[in-house]
Amino acid sequence: METVATIQTPTKLMNKENAEMILEKIVNHIAMYISDESIYSENNPEYIDFRNRYGDYRSLIIKSDHEFVKLCKDHAEKSSPETQQMIIKHIYEQYLIPVSEVLLKPIMSMGDIFTYNGCKDNEWMLEQLSTLNFNNLYTWNSCSIGNVTRLFYTFFSYLMKDKLNI
């Protein structure tokens, strides 16, 4: 029986425990997937097609950047507000800005761009995150990872909107 990360109401997603659980699972899976270089073989048609469409996005997200993985995992542990600020700012500056510019904007509709730029539609974002199925992560492909990266970006934007003046 498959288990979906079920949230009673969308607003409950933003409590500390649920937010950190989702963040940690997403980060762990992205790190695992991107570190498996065999998936990115020149003989893999799915990878070739994705790379031709969107470029080699791995270096924009994690690739072999252990600092990124460590910072994200640290975010899921108890840390001071100052440390969390540093983590969020690092992720925003080093990863989310280039991911948005290079990977996300070219594949977003105008409605998506409006939603992501201002996080205007928080209900939509919370609904998407609440339906992620963490039991079948091993079946996710490049497009799934790209879609989750979009949610990941939005999730951090939501967390940061009242914390940083960027």
UniProtKB/Swiss-Prot annotation:
CC annotations in GO: host cell cytoplasm
Protein localization: Host cytoplasm
Swiss-Prot/TrEMBL induction comment: Expressed in the intermediate phase of the viral replicative cycle.
Primary localization class, coarse: host cell
Name of protein: Protein OPG069
The family this protein is said to belong to: Belongs to the orthopoxvirus OPG069 family.
Organism (species): Monkeypox virus
This protein's UniProt keywords: Host cytoplasm, Lipoprotein, Myristate
InterPro entries per record: E7R_orthopoxvir
Gene that specifies this protein: OPG069
Posttranslational mods: Myristoylated.
Domain of life: Viruses
